[in-house]
Amino acid sequence: MPLVGHQHQIDILELTDKGDGKGRLFDRPLFVEGLLPGEQALVELTEVKPNYLHGKLVELTQPSADRVPDFCPNTECGGCQVRPLAYPAQLKLKQSLVQSALEQVGLGETQVNPILGMDSPFAYRNKAQYAVRGSEAGAEIGFYRKHSHDLITADDCAVQDSLHVELNARVRGWMREHDIAAYDEVAHTGCVRNLMTRKGFKSGELMVVLVTLGEALPFEAELLAALADLPVTTLVQNINEVRTNRILGDKNRVLLGSGVIRDKIHELEFEISPLSFFQNNPSQTDVLYSKALEYCELTGSETVF
């Protein structure tokens, strides 16, 4: 009989679409974060339900050949769910997940081609969104711990461009130097709620968006000075006065530049505002669009909508 707190030796059979290892125990599926297919581990049960179990890793007794050393300084943020899995194996996992999804809707005979991967799956994101919180040391800027609103500082990130990380540090330093209050989500007080940065990978243009609770922004000139030696194209104050988890409000105030940046997908140029949707992985967006164009077999005489 499974009981919370009891430990069991298990074999991991597969990965879920959320990146959790899945085994079986007491005729029920058992889900454990951080384990890979083919691994054996000692696991402690943390949740017992009639139809499933959850556990946490106690000891990895037999690692997978596809397990790679941890490269991330922010292991608790939950942003890279299959981080321990070697990249070629991640691509195979994605292919199998698509195949499985098709099978579930009666399309199992559909051919799923191998996933087109990146040359280097690091520092590829063109957008970063950070939460801002106060601490005894002053303002902290980072990510939320998985399944919580606890803040983890983000002094580095393997999938973000290094300029995002530097902008994070500059804004945090400005807030600490001038004692600018971070947003308190319980009391709904403070000044700075969030920081968002965007980079045009082809244009090189850089956007900084500071999300504030109200229209007041103290030490504005000092913020501009703190960013002056970085290639910031535009700086925008976004005002979000609502008690909500939504990051951006509807009102923008441009402090530097035009309030937008530009970037290209193939030969098409896009104007990107703080509220714009734009694919976060620009190099793979090019790959995706190229493959779509290849499959369309266009001759140049068509009108495409």
Where are these regions (language model features)?
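Accessory RNA-recognition modules of RNA-modification enzymes
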Residues: 1-305
